[in-house]
Amino acid sequence: MLADRATLAPAAFSGDVTAADGISRVEWAVNWPADRDDGFINAYCNTIPTPAGGTHEAGMRTALLKGIKAFGDLTGNRKAAQITAEDVMSGACAMLSIFIADPQFQGQTKDKLVSVDASRLVEQAVKDHFDHWLSARPDSAASLLERFIDRAEERIRRR
């Protein structure tokens, strides 16, 4: 995905979790290129591409935002409170795939997942893993926090 580019974290944040029901599953990988702001999220539900995103992407955004804010609080960085999901996801290169029973899509083309449970499933799967990932990589976590704070301050200045 990013083999030829410098990234803020030497190792991508990736993982997979099978839910307690034994059916639902979440797989993800995300990293932030050091040199550019153009990112992407390639998301899938039951191997169906969802180019318009949906509730599963919202769950990932929420988990990453909560995780980086918690890390900011843990390190005593008050500026972390101003970070939004857009600050975290702009420039991120991510892959997200979920497998759920009876997915609900918007429209006939299945471009967007609208299953309410997907957001909660992804957030729960990703959040704890991201917290541990940040704790295990303090240098990468500090670089990410600094980047996100810079983005937040830039966004606030533009108002």
Listing of model-derived features with the role each one plays in the protein:
Residues 1-159:
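GHKL-family ATPase ATP-binding module
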